[in-house]
Amino acid sequence: MSADDAPMTADKGKVQQDDASTAGMNYLESLPRRVVTLYLPLGVFVFVLLFPFYWMATTALKPNAELLSREGNPFWVAQPTLEHFRHLVFETPYPDWMWNTVLVSVVATFFSLAASVFAAYAIERLRFRGSKQTGLVIFLAYLVPPSILFIPLAAIIFKLGIFDTRWALILTYPTFLIPFCTWLLMGYFRTIPYELEECALIDGATRWQILVKIILPLAVPGLISAGIFAFTLSWNEFIYALTFVSSSEVKTVPVGVVTELVEGDVYHWGALMAGALLGSLPVAIMYSFFVEYYVSGMTGAVKE
C-alpha cells in the first residue's frame, strides 16, 4: 500500500466508525428498544441494589408485634415506630461502636494513604532496579486472605500488649489497605507526564517539593478514590475486629451489631436492622458526595 493510500484508509475507518455510532443511536431512538436495552436492565440492577436497604428500613420501623405476626404485608409497615432506634441509641453501646468505627477507619485510612503515596511514588517515578517487581509483590500481598494473616498478626498484637484496644485495629488494617492503595496510586501516577518532574528538577526543585507541589495536586482524584476504598474496607472489616477486640465498649459496628444484639437463639431483628441501616449510611453519604472523584480515580488508575 502506498503512502497516498494511508490517509484514505484512515478516513474510511473513521467513516465506518461514525456510521456504526450513528446506527447505534438510531437503534436507541425507538422507545420499545430503549426500554428493553436500557431501562429494563437498569431497573433490575437498581432493584437488586436497593432492595436490601428497603428491607432494612421497613424491618427497623416495624414494632415487634408486627415483626412476629404472620399476617399483613411483609414488604410494608402498617404501624411505623422508632422504638428500635431509641433502644439502639440509648440502651445499647451502639454510640460507642459508631465512634470506634469512625475513629479506627479515619486513622487507619490516613496512615495507609500516607504510606501508599510514598510507596507508589518511589516505585513508579524513581525508576530503580526491580521497581516493577516490587509493585507486583505489593499487589500480590493484597490477595493474601485475612483469614491467613490474622493468626501471625494475633501473635504480634499479644506481644505488643495492645489486644482489646483500638490500636490493635488501627495497626492491623493497613496490612490490607496499603497494598491495594499503593497499586491504585501507581496506576494514577503513571498518567502524570514525567516531563513535569524533569522541568522541576531543572529549576532546582527537590523530590519532596515535586511530590507535594506537582504530583499530589494532580493526583487528587486518585487520592480520593484510594481514600474512599480504604475507608470503606476499614468501616466494613469484620475478621480482625472480631479477633483482636473482646470488650463491648471497644467493638466496631459490624462486630457489635451481630454479637451484642443477638442473645443466644433470640434475634432482635428490629434493633439489628436499625443498627445495620445506621451503620451503612455514612459510607453511602460519602459515596454520594465523592462518586465523581472515585470514578475519575479508578479510570486513571487502570490506564496504560
Predicted regions and their residues:
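Short, Lys/Arg-rich, polar N-terminal cytosolic tail immediately upstream
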Residues: 2-31
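A structural signal for multi-pass alpha-helical bundles of membrane permease subunits
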Residues: 28-30, 34, 38-304
